[in-house]
Amino acid sequence: MTDVARILKEARDQGRMTALDYASLIFDEFMELHGDRQFADDGSIVGGIAYLADQPVTVIGIQKGKNLQDNLARNFGQPHPEGYRKALRLMKQAEKFGRPVITFINTAGAYPGVGAEERGQGEAIARNLMEMSDLKVPIIAIIIGEGGSGGALALAVADQVWMLENTMYAVLSPEGFASILWKDGSRATEAAELMKITAAELYQMGVIDRIIPERGYFSSEIIEMIRSHLIDEITQLQAKSLEELLDQRYQRFRKY
């Protein structure tokens, strides 16, 4: 098994910690909030408010299940437009009250069903991209499993984007890439090699800002590492003027 194939397998492992795991272990007094105030509450996106070292923050994540029943309830971590609108509602609330936003991303992509498209899936994702680019509070996005397509990017227009060591971030799935390029989805591993989807490759290209090591560390050590980095980075981001914060976020994405 190649290194990329191993990372792809580990990124999709059902045993990985979920967004709710990180929310409860990194932060204090996490309180989940529900609903997009327009249509429904999408269980594949979770979010709420919490404390990080006595600092109020907004935490949002894409939630996969740990078993079949849970995955059905979470739509296998593929958000509907209601999920993205719920996330945006929480981000605008964070902006109103001056709370930094931290997102945890683990999705193969946004749900591509007919109903989701009819309810404006593309618009919901596009609006998140637009609003996040100008959100007037610090944003940190962390890839904790799969970071697939626009479904992941809709929570990743951030001042800092981090990845755990054994995760992936790509414009589409390797299977989708292989199906388009070679009409053969079984060549996914070969596609993954070409796509540059690993944390190490993306860090080298400047797409992400930090890699959180996993190999050789216990889960508790990884949690403490993320917590420490978040405290330090949020302190630095809050020290910037609003003009500087937004300009640097804009330039970060324009350089691609």
Swiss-Prot record:
Q: What is its main location?
A: cytoplasm
| Enzyme Commission no | 2.1.3.15
Pathway involvement? Lipid metabolism; malonyl-CoA biosynthesis; malonyl-CoA from acetyl-CoA: step 1/1
UniProtKB keywords: ATP-binding, Cytoplasm, Fatty acid biosynthesis, Fatty acid metabolism, Lipid biosynthesis, Lipid metabolism, Nucleotide-binding, Transferase
Domain CoA carboxyltransferase C-terminal spans what residues? 1-236
Which is one GO molecular function term here? Answer: carboxyl- or carbamoyltransferase activity
Q: Which compartments is it annotated to reside in? A: Cytoplasm
What Pfam families is this protein classified in? Answer: ACCA
Q: Which reaction does it catalyse?
A: N(6)-carboxybiotinyl-L-lysyl-[protein] + acetyl-CoA = N(6)-biotinyl-L-lysyl-[protein] + malonyl-CoA
Query: GO CC terms on record?
Result: acetyl-CoA carboxylase complex
Q: What class of enzyme is it?
A: transferase
Cross-referenced InterPro entries, in alphabetical order? Acetyl_CoA_COase_a_su, ClpP/crotonase-like_dom_sf, COA_CT_C
Q: Which Gene3D superfamilies match?
A: 2-enoyl-CoA Hydratase, Chain A, domain 1
A Gene Ontology biological process term: malonyl-CoA biosynthetic process
Q: Which PROSITE patterns match?
A: COA_CT_CTER
Biological function: Component of the acetyl coenzyme A carboxylase (ACC) complex. First, biotin carboxylase catalyzes the carboxylation of biotin on its carrier protein (BCCP) and then the CO(2) group is transferred by the carboxyltransferase to acetyl-CoA to form malonyl-CoA.
Q: Which family does it belong to?
A: Belongs to the AccA family.
Tell me the subunit arrangement.
Acetyl-CoA carboxylase is a heterohexamer composed of biotin carboxyl carrier protein (AccB), biotin carboxylase (AccC) and two subunits each of ACCase subunit alpha (AccA) and ACCase subunit beta (AccD).
Protein name (Swiss-Prot/TrEMBL): Acetyl-coenzyme A carboxylase carboxyl transferase subunit alpha
The scientific name of the source species is Streptococcus equi subsp. zooepidemicus (strain MGCS10565)
